[in-house]
Amino acid sequence: MSFTGRPRITLALFMLAVLGALAPGAGTRAQNAASPTVYTIELVVFRNMSGSGGPEDWGAKAVARGPESPEQPVVTGRFVQSIPAAQFQLNDVAAKLQNTSNYQPIAHFAWQQTASTWGSRAGFTVAKLAGSVPGLSGIIYLERGSYLHLGMSLNYQTSNPPSGLAAPPGTVFNLTESHRVRFRTLSYFDHPAYGVIALVTPGNAATGGR
């Protein structure tokens, strides 16, 4: 099964059951010298309605993996274009989530860009990539060194967190992670309050990444 990430146990079981058959076949590894410089990135952000992760210190800020300082010279990724919904590749994943009672999509968007330098954390805001998504903000970045990494530092605020999280209304939940990614392989970014399923594929600006 083409799926990467470090999901919590309860959500991992759900993802294995629901998404396993939907994951695209593994493709070329991102570190291949012949890899294209334009990438298509598609994300489905969904809310965990169950609160099964339990209470935590919601004020704690995680630190994404990566070097203490970026590789030199520093290159900032270039935004190429947004991808229209008609060309989304994760519609089946979003539909599966929508049909559950515990995991509800709150955003689904895709775009093309070139990669930033590994360790630079140079990316684009949710507002630029997805427009206005109630309660969701932050930065998403694609970095390339020896390998390709997708990272994000997201904040999600809701007036009615699941009771199991023991979080008061208006709590801001921070998700900060960076994963090594491979083409056409689903990646999962995990938080007790919400999660992100991501797909990175070689992009072609002339064909909308297909």
Regions found by a protein language model. Name each.
Residues 12-21:
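Bacterial N-terminal signal peptides
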Residues 1-7:
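N-terminal secretory signal peptides that target proteins for export/translocation
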Residues 1, 111, 184-187:
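Aromatic-residue detector
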Residues 17, 26-28:
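Cleavable N-terminal signal peptides
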